[in-house]
């Protein structure tokens, strides 16, 4: 359970949900991300687990910090939304 909380926090930060709040419409909660990326340093263990689960993807090349840039897939957005009880739009919609 502790690890799941860590993954939820990483995913929330990736889409900016740690800075912006969801909105309510027709008594349901929604969130429209203003971003969907997370640049890591060398420690990528949490993100690699989410990639293996199909919830995230990453660039093939390392970034300037020695890590990778990750983003949530549609499956990852749906998983996070289920965990938080909100519908998360894809920022490309």
Predicted feature residues:
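Short amphipathic alpha-helical interface segments
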Residues: 1-45, 86
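Short amphipathic alpha-helical interaction segments
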Residues: 36-58, 67
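Conserved catalytic-core motifs of GNAT/GCN5-like acyltransferases
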Residues: 61
């Amino acid at each position: 359970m502790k690890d799941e909380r860590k993954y939820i926090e990483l995913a929330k930060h990736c889409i900016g949900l740690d800075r912006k709040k969801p909105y309510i419409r027709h008594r349901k909660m929604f969130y429209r991300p203003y971003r969907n990326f997370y640049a890591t340093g060398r420690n990528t263990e949490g993100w690699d687990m989410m990639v293996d689960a199909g919830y995230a993807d990453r660039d093939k090349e390392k970034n300037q910090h020695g890590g990778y840039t990750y983003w949530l897939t549609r499956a990852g957005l749906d998983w996070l939304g289920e965990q938080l009880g909100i519908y998360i739009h894809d920022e490309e919609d």
